[in-house]
Amino acid sequence: MASVIPASNRSMRSDRNTYVGKRFVHVKNPYLDLMDEDILYHLDLGTKTHNLPAMFGDVKFVCVGGSPNRMKAFALFMHKELGFEEAEEDIKDICAGTDRYCMYKTGPVLAISHGMGIPSISIMLHELIKLLHHARCCDVTIIRIGTSGGIGIAPGTVVITDIAVDSFFKPRFEQVILDNIVTRSTELDKELSEELFNCSKEIPNFPTLVGHTMCTYDFYEGQGRLDGALCSFSREKKLDYLKRAFKAGVRNIEMESTVFAAMCGLCGLKAAVVCVTLLDRLDCDQINLPHDVLVEYQQRPQLLISNFIRRRLGLCD
């Protein structure tokens, strides 16, 4: 696909957002070099069956989100925002041979679904990072966009994560590897979060803040909900926990950010998490927004990332 940047604008700027740095994606596995073929099973791709550099070598922005339909909608939205003339029907699911994830590409933007929870996004990230490595991509920015529950903030607020924390409000991801617990850092790229926050200021009526995001292993008891099939705590215990989370700097809760931050950081990817809140967990546990309001809220992270990408590519007025 042709460059989205007009020929007259293709000289890159000399500020910190330039692509000239050639920051490649690193895999931390010496055994990959010994393999004749790498099959990315859950993506229905492979190093012998596909020309990954030709297919993905120009990727600069990767956006991941839980819902397949939402990621398809984001890809179609970016296709229009970047001014491509090809019909939307030309944007096909690259992972159509599998029912695990979906993947769409438009210009330098790759959109991929990751399902719900740490195990699902972890599998996708392993294969995505290897894909970017095999494709020899460089200077890639990866952003998770999604929905979340807020703590002490109004529904519809967009939270840009500075640090992902676990259920103990600690900036760490604990991975069980063989019979050991390995602890990894969950810090995200500070300059990227600041850049995204500055982009949000250009959008009217767009409440945004930077704060900690708590990542849990469960949607119900793990997030202190009283409405699951099981509940082993009181309303008072729930509120005490959420208030302590707020005091620790947590502004929203989801289920993927710690492993996302840890894996991207280890592999040299500049990463960010941008989630809209659908409710204030201090007030309620269930999402009861009108459908049109819910749809508009869900589009807010997409709108911010579109503005960010267009600005990076020099396409903003």
From Swiss-Prot:
Residues that hold uridine according to the record: S148, G149, Q223, G224, R225
Catalytic class of the enzyme: transferase
Pfam families referenced in this protein's UniProt entry, alphabetically: PNP_UDP_1 (PF01048)
Cellular-component GO terms for this entry: cytosol; type III intermediate filament
Tissue: Predominantly expressed in kidney.
A GO molecular-function annotation: identical protein binding
EC identifiers of the protein: 2.4.2.3
Membrane-spanning intervals of the chain: none
GO biological process per UniProt: CMP catabolic process; dCMP catabolic process; nucleoside metabolic process; UMP catabolic process; UMP salvage; uridine catabolic process; uridine metabolic process
Activity control note: A conditional disulfide bridge can form within the protein that dislocates a critical phosphate-coordinating arginine Arg-100 away from the active site, disabling the enzyme.
Keywords from the UniProt entry: Disulfide bond, Glycosyltransferase, Redox-active center, Transferase
Binding site for phosphate: G66, R100, R144, I145, G146, T147
Pathway assignment: Pyrimidine metabolism; UMP biosynthesis via salvage pathway; uracil from uridine (phosphorylase route): step 1/1
Paired cysteines (S-S): C95-C102
Catalytic activity: uridine + phosphate = alpha-D-ribose 1-phosphate + uracil; 2'-deoxyuridine + phosphate = 2-deoxy-alpha-D-ribose 1-phosphate + uracil
Subunit structure: Homodimer.
Family from the record: Belongs to the PNP/UDP phosphorylase family.
PANTHER family linked: URIDINE PHOSPHORYLASE, URIDINE PHOSPHORYLASE 2
Function recorded in the entry: Catalyzes the reversible phosphorylytic cleavage of uridine to uracil and ribose-1-phosphate which can then be utilized as carbon and energy sources or in the rescue of pyrimidine bases for nucleotide synthesis. Shows broad substrate specificity and can also accept deoxyuridine and other analogous compounds.
NCBIfam families referenced in this protein's UniProt entry, alphabetically: euk_UDPppase (TIGR01719)
Protein name (Swiss-Prot/TrEMBL): Uridine phosphorylase 2
Native source organism of the sequence: Homo sapiens
